[in-house]
């Protein structure tokens, strides 16, 4: 999110109820729609996958006293109220915390807003360029359980189908999920029949398979290289024996129940 989006995100975070959150999200929706339209235009009809909101909400709130005071003024709340909200967002392990699709489960209005932005952008670009075939691809991050994915996908499809019908369009779209959690990889055969595509998130999958944090592993990995326990940085080169084997098995299991599931990978490897 660019800097001009942050106030609306903070307004959403500070909301006391669904109505207030939806009001804040209504400010974000046209911004996101505009961004998506620009990206669709740049790609000239080529496929584009849009990942739904993934970072934990604490990343959008200030940490410095001066910034906290400014946020309190902007939000019409006391400094103490803002500090209480920020404290409530604190997590001991944010990477494994309230982020990804978990945000859409607890705040389904976020998924509804992002779906509207994606579909309305695609419809607008399709209308301007009838020679292009727009097929929006929506990716749900941090899925670890089929019912979790099904819950969020149902939000997406209900909103998307209504918008497409209202537009009198026959536009198709896809809904898939990231596989970053080992459990999702192990349950790929359960998830695949309900998913149009898998995208293996190699960064988080590596962290969770190895059981160490990318931010902290530098404290001991050099010793592992010196002692030939690891030959290279597992965050720079994908581990073939462990992480790679899990990905290969997940591909096989997923294709066993949905031969047409599209397979991809994203990350820094």
Question: Model-found features: residue ranges?
Answer:
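Conserved alpha/beta-domain cores
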Residues: 1-269
